[in-house]
Amino acid sequence: MTATLERRESASLWERFCTWITSTENRLYIGWFGVVMIPTLLTATSVFIIAFVAAPPVDIDGIREPVAGSLLYGNNIISGAIIPSSAAIGIHFYPIWEAASLDEWLYNGGPYQLIVLHFLLGVCCYIGREWELSYRLGMRPWISVAFTAPVAAAAAVFLVYPIGQGSFSDGMPLGISGTFNFMLVFQAEHNILMHPFHQLGVAGVFGGSLFSAMHGSLVTSSLIRETTENESANYGYKFGQEEETYNIVAAHGYFGRLIFQYASFNNSRALHFFLGAWPVVGIWLTSMSVSTMALNLNGFNFNQSVVDSQGRVINTWADILNRANLGMEVMHERNAHNFPLDLASGDSCPVALVAPSING
């Protein structure tokens, strides 16, 4: 018998790279979306850290009154933030090469755009990477669909809202106190608490937390014990086991008696679909609310909607909320505006009868 041996041509560098990129045996899956995700998220993270520590003040309102947000300029972890790009830039694309100098780019808040745009591109690629890994493992694609909810929320406050308002200076600052400031100003200008989509989003987030706690506690309370009383029930589980790890019938019976029968799921697939869909749909709706208010389609305003037979206003909670909104708006951009437009809608009072003459 004669054996013929042929030399196998070695795979090219590109083929080996493709195999490595798409291999599901790696400790961390990279994938083709990861080729874009990794550098963009590393760039966003690096610039965020540097700017949070050392960025100079930014002229956010475009009135030559810079606001400091970095640690080296007197802030701490709570008060520090990446200040949004200047109102003088508007929604123009403002990379480093568009500025006359690096100092000008920093003064006008260029790092904010760099971080936000790289971050959004990176998390969108993360969605694609989740789908790609699911596809290669033969799984269904719903993990990536669920992650579209937080990405939609981030895109709403960092991109859609600034574009709708005409300036990146209206975007959410990248910091703890900056986030709260953004929320207060958003309420003052758009009455978001009275927007139905936002209310549904709150129900989605809080309801999701409630359902998660209920499900976790029910499962933990109905584990099928495979161990002795002297060992943790957790040791009775073997990874990849075919048997159920908890008794869904017992959990269903408990919850059905605690509230009423039809408040409890008796189908595990329907239960877990509900647990996944409820918060995701809620966050989608919240993102839609911010996106609609970007175009000033604001929340409901019921102030002064109740009057007596003489036409006098009977104050309701809506009027208290409206007064709170006006108070927050007064505090916002106090150097750019003396008072909000809502308070300036009355008759104007003349303060000068003759235009002053200017000599020189």
UniProtKB/Swiss-Prot annotation:
The chain crosses the membrane at residues 29-46, 118-133, 142-156, 197-218, 274-288. The record marks 161 as: Tyrosine radical intermediate. Fe cation binds at residues 215, 272. Chlorophyll a ChlzD1 binds at residue 118. [CaMn4O5] cluster binds at residues 170, 189, 332-333, 342, 344. Its EC number is 1.10.3.9. A quinone binds at residues 215, 264-265. Coiled coil: none annotated. Photosystem II (PSII) is a light-driven water:plastoquinone oxidoreductase that uses light energy to abstract electrons from H(2)O, generating O(2) and a proton gradient subsequently used for ATP formation. It consists of a core antenna complex that captures photons, and an electron transfer chain that converts photonic excitation into a charge separation. The D1/D2 (PsbA/PsbD) reaction center heterodimer binds P680, the primary electron donor of PSII as well as several subsequent electron acceptors. PANTHER family: PHOTOSYSTEM II D2 PROTEIN, PHOTOSYSTEM II PROTEIN D1. This is Photosystem II protein D1. The lineage of its organism: Eukaryota, Rhodophyta, Florideophyceae, Nemaliophycidae, Palmariales. The gene is psbA.
